[in-house]
A protein has these predicted regions:
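N-terminal strand-loop-strand
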Residues: 119-153
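A contiguous binding-surface segment within folded domains or other stable secondary-structure elements
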Residues: 38, 148, 159
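Unchanged
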Residues: 156-215
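Short beta-strand element of the conserved SAM-dependent methyltransferase core
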Residues: 91, 128, 205-209
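Thr-Gly-centered strand-to-loop micro-motif
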Residues: 47, 153-155
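Hydrophobic N-terminal alpha-helices or hydrophobic patches in metabolic proteins across all domains
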Residues: 2-121
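Short, charged/polar surface micro-motifs in flexible loops or helix N-caps
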Residues: 27, 50-53, 65-68, 135-137, ...
Length: 215
């Protein structure tokens, strides 16, 4: 199975409700390559669906505290392994939405050994409202989006293991090449539906641009 075929297989399950068999329940101790793992979550597979490693497609089950043998839930995310021959699905109770960061934190006990990319039904974008003071007035920075011809604040997708503020700082650096002073008591967020069960969360901080001659 090629990497593209693997990715297409995993992606086809995002948002679907399926039943999994659990072969490593919460608390299970597993040893691989002389490394011992204690599973803090339930871990199983979709019967009859073969993944990239030639075995049944594996699934992390999140937000279910008790050890189980079987569970029916919604696939809310995918862990793509860039340096391995298999990917993992992420399941939770139906209607649950977790960000890439929240998923990454819960599967870190295994995925810390791999280079991974995480997709989820909840996409989080973080950025900043940037202003400068001129003649006792505030001037706010807006970016013109080339394709939509609309204006927006600088923002971008949160990456695994980033905080919201770290994402906003990175986007300011990447999009407009500045560092700004963050106001400690201002953070606003909003969530809305996109399509096919996906939601988006946008988080904005208030920042002041100081000492940037090009702004």
């Amino acid at each position: 199975m090629t990497a593209e075929e693997r990715k297409n297989l995993a992606s086809s399950y995002l948002g679907k409700v399926v039943t999994i068999k659990i072969d490593r329940p919460k608390g299970f101790v597993h040893t691989k390559n002389n490394v011992e793992f204690t599973y803090p979550i339930n871990y199983g597979y979709i019967p009859g669906v073969i993944g990239g490693d030639g075995e049944e497609l594996d699934v992390y089950l999140l937000l279910v505290d008790e050890p189980l043998e079987e569970y029916t839930g919604e696939i809310i995310g995918i862990v793509y392994r860039k340096n391995d021959n298999e990917d993992k699905l992420v399941m939770a109770p139906r209607g649950t939405r977790l960000s890439q960061k929240e998923i990454a934190e819960q599967v870190y006990f295994r995925e810390q050994y791999y280079k991974t990319e995480i997709d989820s039904l909840l996409h989080v974008s973080c950025g900043a409202l940037v202003y400068r003071k001129r003649n006792s007035q505030r001037e706010y920075l807006c970016l013109l989006q080339k394709h939509s011809q609309t204006y927006s604040a600088p923002k971008g997708h949160m990456e695994a293991f980033e905080t919201e503020k770290q994402t906003a700082e990175r986007e300011l650096s990447e999009e407009i090449g500045i560092r700004a002073k963050f106001h400690p008591n201002f953070k606003k967020s909003a969530e809305y539906d996109i399509s096919r069960g996906r939601r988006k969360k946008v988080v904005l901080f208030l920042t002041e641009c100081v000492g940037e001659p090009n702004i």
